[in-house]
């Protein structure tokens, strides 16, 4: 099915990209031709979920291939270590003979668990950020100037390259992706790109990026940032094609959580998202595309329930090796190819007991078919929403369907019994081993890969 040898894998994980922020998902004001091409040359998933938002827990769950609650991560808990008795996706692929590369944002595990300690053989250093002069700051809008002054004049999205020239950070990442592909075109590789884009604040975005879009108001800045992400997907596709690797490479494109409404992000046709909307569908439903011409169908939509922890099992299926037993994910390939109908999961569950930010991030929920059962705290009554008829979740129908409430609540209770208790973040005294600032790449020392269990 996949030709001679094991395929390459590129996993792109955008920060705060909303379900309604891509043209292939119905967005009308932000052209994303290269990402749209992934969808045209692959499978667009319309019920793809993050079961442990936001950024940090989402990434940890994805890299481990299981519910974060299975290893004691129930909310942000930034700095909580990844379990070391089971392999990460990168460790699994490294054990299969892959060169494993990381570019961009990390935000995973403890301070001593950087990319090189968790299975990546190469990690791109983070370029130094531009330092604005006082004169440059005075030329900026008052709102942007205030944000930058809070960071002592250090830019969020402009960096300085090897030649001392100022670059847009997302462009810099795209060049690193091209470099990685060219360096390893004769090897099996796994590349994980997780840009800082399109995380707030986006008000540094240059006008030429915003001018491509039809977005208005605050959304123009976000739109420009999304346009830059799309440019890098185009660079990647060109690099793969010039190396005759496009049909030998699976590209998985997704987001770590839903849209940031404060930046003008859209979860349409659903409600909710980052900030004030973390109790609704838009916070956890994200765009996800699987693209591999010749191996997956083109221009297909998959409506079944999937989760970000399915990426691990799906990639393992592509490689031809069973996923480790700790994985909660399902190999999606038979569903993406139309060999199996329906959903890979009958149910998906949420239990985000966020110790540090209960007001925004407590979330208890179940998804089943068209239904979403929800409550914020254990003491609250269950609410039930028919997402097909009521995507904005405005009409609680729990009283009309008590049998469904009972069914889903019982399923949730049974799932909770399989979880690991909330773990505390240990105080580490060891030096940080995360991505370092500089140019070029860091390379991992050889280390035994966990066998799982």
Role assignments for model-derived ranges:
Residues 1-382, 389-417, 421-427, 435-453:
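Formylglycine-dependent sulfatase
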């Amino acid at each position: 099915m996949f030709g001679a040898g094991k395929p390459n894998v590129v996993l792109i994980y955008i920060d705060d990209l909303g379900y309604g922020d891509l043209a292939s998902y119905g967005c009308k004001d932000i052209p994303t031709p290269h990402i749209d091409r992934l969808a045209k040359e692959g499978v667009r998933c319309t019920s793809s979920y993050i079961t442990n938002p936001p950024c940090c827990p989402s990434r940890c769950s994805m890299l481990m291939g299981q519910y974060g609650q299975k290893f004691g991560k129930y909310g942000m808990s930034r700095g909580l270590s990844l379990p070391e008795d089971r392999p990460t996706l990168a460790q699994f692929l490294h054990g299969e003979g892959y060169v494993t590369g990381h570019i961009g944002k990390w935000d995973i595990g403890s301070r001593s668990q950087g990319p090189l300690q968790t299975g990546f053989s190469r990690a791109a250093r983070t370029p130094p950020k531009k330092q604005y002069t006082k004169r440059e700051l005075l030329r900026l809008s008052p709102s942007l100037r205030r944000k930058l002054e809070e960071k002592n004049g250090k830019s969020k999205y402009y960096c300085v390259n090897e030649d001392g020239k100022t670059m847009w950070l997302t462009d810099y990442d795209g060049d690193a992706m091209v470099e990685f592909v060219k360096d390893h075109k004769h090897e099996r590789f796994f590349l994980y790109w997780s840009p800082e884009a399109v995380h707030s604040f986006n008000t540094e975005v240059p006008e030429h990026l915003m001018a491509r879009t039809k977005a208005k108001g605050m959304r123009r800045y976000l739109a420009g940032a999304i346009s830059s992400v799309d440019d890098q997907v185009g660079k990647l596709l060109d690099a793969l094609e010039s190396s005759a690797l496009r049909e030998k490479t699976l590209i998985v494109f997704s987001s770590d959580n839903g849209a940031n409404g404060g930046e003008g992000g859209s979860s349409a046709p659903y409600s909710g998202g980052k900030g004030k909307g973390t109790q609704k569908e838009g916070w956890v439903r994200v765009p996800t595309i699987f693209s591999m011409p010749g191996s997956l169908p083109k221009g297909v939509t998959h409506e079944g329930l999937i989760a970000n922890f399915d990426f691990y099992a799906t990639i393992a299926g592509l490689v031809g090796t069973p996923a480790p037993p700790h994985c909660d994910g399902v190999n999606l390939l038979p569903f993406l190819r139309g060999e199996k109908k329906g959903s890979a999961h009958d149910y998906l569950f949420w239990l985000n007991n966020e110790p540090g930010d209960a007001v925004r991030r407590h979330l208890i929920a179940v998804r089943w078919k068209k239904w979403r059962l929800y409550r914020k705290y254990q003491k609250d009554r269950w609410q039930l929403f028919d997402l097909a008829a009521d995507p904005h979740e405005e009409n609680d129908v729990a009283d009309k369907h008590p049998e469904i409430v009972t069914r889903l609540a019982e399923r949730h209770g049974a799932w909770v019994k399989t979880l690991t208790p909330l773990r505390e973040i240990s105080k580490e005294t060891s030096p940080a081993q995360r991505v370092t600032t500089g140019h070029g790449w860091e390379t991992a020392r050889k280390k035994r890969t966990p066998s799982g269990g």
